[in-house]
Amino acid sequence: MRLIERGSGTPRVAIVGGIHGDEPAGERIVERLLEELTVEDGVDEGTVQLVVANEPALAVGERFTETDLNRTFPGDVESDTYETALAARLTTVLEGADAILALHTSHSAPPPFAIYTHLSDTVRKTVTGMPVDYVVDVSSLRPTTLDSTLPNTISLETGRQGSEDAVEFGVEAARAFLRTHGILQDEEPTFTEKTVVSVEEEVPKGEGTPEVYYRNFEEIPKGEVFARDDVYTHRAPRDGLVPVLASEHGYEDIFGLYGRVAGTMEPEHS
């Protein structure tokens, strides 16, 4: 793990890239921010922690070395499994931060979107300050991710894995995050309403050639095929479902998630 701090005092916010080694955009976004936020200049107020999390996995371009880092929080510092011990170290570094942004990419088609588990005032502020239209509530899923473990944390899917667009958008979004929390004061932050999608269940994947027929947040009519392979043919079991993280090759065991539009998230004091 690599940690670089800029600025001093409060608030203290963190931007974390490289949780998965096959998502190099996060590391590149952190490197771009380091170029802009020099020791002498760049931070107007407070402290920003810039973290590259899983350096060994990034070095070999694999999602993880032993186990998925984002499935093992809060971790165990005594563990012999690399990512499990790393999760505990990362948790210690970030504990007490006023706001945390975790950067990710996926094999899904755009648009980028935010993810949260626990809706606090800080999470609302962060999300409504992001340049995205959608935010996904994953509170019904596993409690072993960074955003489910540390308060005031959101994850951000910046775009398609391996694309330059994901890097450029991630830098833009990271700047927006820093403006939202007063670290950057070069311009006023912008807060906008977001569409909230609540995740309901994972959609399993089997063997054979996978096919996905709907993009993220595109409503699937009841009974229509969302995805199939040699084992499964998934038809939407009820009305109102939309895919989240839908892809043919993004995950070994799922096509993505079924979600449902649950309303909107308004900026504070709107």
Model-predicted segments: where are they?
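Structured catalytic-domain cores with a bias toward divalent-metal coordination
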Residues: 1-270
